[in-house]
Amino acid sequence: SNINGKYSIKIQQYQTLVFSYIGFKTVSILVKGDTKVINIKMQEEKINAVDEVVVTGLGKQKKLTITGAITNVDVDKLRKYPTSNFTNALAGNVPGIITMQSSGQPGKNTSRFWVRGISTFGASSDAMILVDGFERPNIDDLNIEDIESFSVLKDASATAIYGSKGANGVILITTKHGKAGKINITAKGETSYNTRTITPKFVDAYNYATLLNEARITRNLAPQYQPEELALIKSGLDPDFYPNVDWTNLLLKDGAMSYRADINLNGGGNTARYFASLAYVEDQGMYNTDETLRKKYNTNANYKRWNYRMNLDIDITPTTILKLGISGNLNKRNSPGLGDQYVWGELFGFNALSSPVRYSNGYIPAYGRNTYQMNPWVSATQTGYNQEWNNNIQTNITIEQQLDFLIKGLTFTGRFGYDTYNSNYIHHR
């Protein structure tokens, strides 16, 4: 048939037409009477475990013929997880991989992962990562919708081709490429709501003062607050000197939204095929902001990322394929002026009595009473904000030449890649 699926064939009555295509169920039609037009619709076939193809260091092989420890990851399963970072979806979904997320800050909520344990061979325990045959330092910013296959090589027999670099395991990722046929456009959008998992609960000012007095008395020390002071704290008549501030409720939202959108298209003919995609990811932060400040003065943490990819396959000759690829991402991370970690440090170091948010005359205290710690509201909203821009561009060229005339199954593969990275850090006061 042609690329539109139209075909013409001469056939006699009561003969059977058989339609088959790799990856689809075979369809058989018995021709009866004066039938001139036969339209069929083929359904995708679930691959039998025995016939399953796995990507290895030497190319694609049937799972039945592999003796090494290789895990073929179900990428469709990973796509179901509403996360802006691909590495977070690996936890619990890839056998043998240990993952650890060290931060929940937007843009830094990545997971470090190990294939052969944390204490492994060599100075570094990180696995080697190859995307379309090119080594990459990480996969934090990879668009999950661009992934065609994901394999994990674990033991020596599977990773031997990579030498000492593969001693801690190898991650092989193949991105999507175009298929011959009509243009196919796919669009997808997701939204999710993220909440804090565990946040310590702090007592109010009166309970804090009472418990502090009890603690000092048990250590044979004088009480910190006298009865008349406790009465003022309980009544709330002097908020300047005896405040009662719920800092957690003041600084933190109950949750924040995340968004993910992707559009891709692929198609082509027998000579050239293409795949192109665009993606957008956004994670909003959980800090409240000072509404009295100008609208563009956003001290809340947030993260935005734009991904793009273009893969072009050209059949130069029946035995020679040229593959051209360009991909990259532009991301922007916003954070309070002193940094996220500083805000949390001040929040957990302050109690309800340490300082009012504002004095009754409108002034904002920079530091708490009897402490060198900064007012959490000041550190989160009054110290400016930071913008960090990162731009990554990755280009690659691959040529594959079949050498069956020398040895059947022999293929020569040559690769060339050029990457550029740049970043820009801006502090707004």
What are these regions (language model features)?
Residues 214-216, 338, 418-428:
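Eukaryote-specific, cytoplasm-facing alpha-helical/coiled-coil scaffolding segments in long proteins
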Residues 188-192, 279-281, 327-329, 400, ...:
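Outer-membrane beta-barrel pore domains and translocons
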Residues 178-183, 270-271, 286, 319, ...:
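Short loop/turn motifs that connect adjacent beta-strands in outer-membrane beta-barrel proteins
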Residues 221-224, 237, 357-361, 378:
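Extracytoplasmic gating/loop element in the C-terminal half of outer-membrane beta-barrel translocons
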